[in-house]
């Protein structure tokens, strides 16, 4: 009688260990799909095509550009900054993108936990509140530059996810 639950557990063990590996691949695929979806949403906003992601715009240096090395924690930190910037904009174009960034950050946390990476919840810019006046004066420029740089960062993240980034 004591062997009953133990025997069932041992019988199910190969299936349970196999099922463990499948979701991580699915999470990685879902992450890539969501990145592609966000890039498509940005492409659908017509005015984002007018600025290069590499172009320097005075006063908007707080918007992150491309990083040479993107670990999972750096990806999360970058997305947190973009999410904070987008939620500060009044445009309805960016609401869904901001929500997608939150979901993307959750997927990155799942990927990190699968690699036993302690990935603390990244915070956005602490100085963004002090830039309130500058943001209000240039909302359109901020939106265009932020979306353009976000798109370039997402495409870089997509490429780096294939290389299995570190913690």
UniProtKB/Swiss-Prot annotation:
GO terms for molecular function: DNA binding; hormone activity; leptin receptor binding; peptide hormone receptor binding. Transmembrane segments: none annotated. Its main location: secreted. One of its GO terms (biological process) is regulation of cytokine production involved in inflammatory response. The keyword Signal applies. It is found in: Secreted. Pfam families: Leptin. The keyword Secreted applies. Disulfide bonds join 117-167. GO terms for cellular component: cytoplasm; extracellular space. Residues 1-21 form the signal peptide. It comes from the Eukaryota. Keywords: Disulfide bond, Obesity, Secreted, Signal. Key player in the regulation of energy balance and body weight control. Once released into the circulation, has central and peripheral effects by binding LEPR, found in many tissues, which results in the activation of several major signaling pathways. In the hypothalamus, acts as an appetite-regulating factor that induces a decrease in food intake and an increase in energy consumption by inducing anorexinogenic factors and suppressing orexigenic neuropeptides, also regulates bone mass and secretion of hypothalamo-pituitary-adrenal hormones. Belongs to the leptin family. This is Leptin. It comes from Felis catus (Cat).
């Amino acid at each position: 009688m004591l062997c009953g639950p133990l025997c069932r557990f041992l019988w199910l063990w190969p299936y349970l260990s196999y099922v463990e590996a499948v979701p991580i691949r699915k999470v990685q695929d879902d992450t890539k799909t969501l990145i592609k979806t966000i890039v498509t949403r940005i492409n659908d906003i017509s005015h984002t095509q007018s600025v290069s992601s590499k172009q320097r715009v005075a006063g908007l240096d707080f918007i992150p550009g491309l990083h040479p090395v993107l670990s999972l924690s750096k990806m999360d930190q970058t997305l947190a900054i973009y999410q904070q910037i987008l939620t500060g904009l009044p445009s309805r174009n960016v609401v869904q993108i901001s929500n997608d960034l939150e979901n993307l950050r959750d997927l990155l946390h799942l990927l990190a936990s699968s690699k036993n990476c302690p990935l603390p919840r990244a915070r956005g810019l602490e100085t963004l509140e002090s830039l309130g006046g500058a943001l209000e004066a240039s909302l359109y420029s901020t939106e265009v530059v932020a979306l353009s740089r976000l798109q370039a960062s997402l495409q870089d993240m997509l490429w780096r996810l294939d290389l299995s980034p570190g913690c």
